[in-house]
Amino acid sequence: MTHPLVPPITDLAIPVAEQLGLEVVGIVFHTNQRPPVLRIDIRNPQQDTGLDDCERMSRALEAALDATEIIPDAYVLEVSSPGISRQLVTDREFISFKGFPVIVSTSPPHEEQQEWIGQLIRRDETKVYINQKGRVIEIPRPLITRVLLYDGE
């Protein structure tokens, strides 16, 4: 369940990231820790996300959060990159990672196979399309449990 502060934090974080040329790809507020930890995952769409990107976002977002007082108590802000092994969810991510290697998991199995590895072609309303050694594989979306970027390991 999403913490009730995540939507207003998201509304604040997205424009801050956009001003820096970055994208917010995930926000989690861990309130089971003392102090609570606000974790923001970012991506630089122009190049590999680096430490400098995380530092710039951290400084800018910290100032914005402090100014709005969305989080009334002490907290720890962590800004990081989600890394290569991450799940594709939004249409924007499927467009951004076209041509990248992915692993598509299905349940129940599609054509007697539960995991498919190939180059991402696209996603439409009904299917995800991947290229597997020159052959286009069409996987019905209702069967897909997740699509992850694949790093070959």
From Swiss-Prot:
Transmembrane segments: none annotated. It is found in: Cytoplasm. GO terms for cellular component: cytosol. GO terms for biological process: ribosomal small subunit assembly; translation. Keywords: Cytoplasm, Ribosome biogenesis. It holds the Pfam family RimP_N. InterPro entries: Ribosome_maturation_RimP, RimP_C_sf, RimP_N, RimP_N_sf. Gene3D superfamilies: RimP-like superfamily, N-terminal (3.30.300.70). HAMAP family: RimP (MF_01077). PANTHER family: RIBOSOME MATURATION FACTOR RIMP. Required for maturation of 30S ribosomal subunits. Belongs to the RimP family. This is Ribosome maturation factor RimP. It comes from Nostoc sp. (strain PCC 7120 / SAG 25.82 / UTEX 2576).
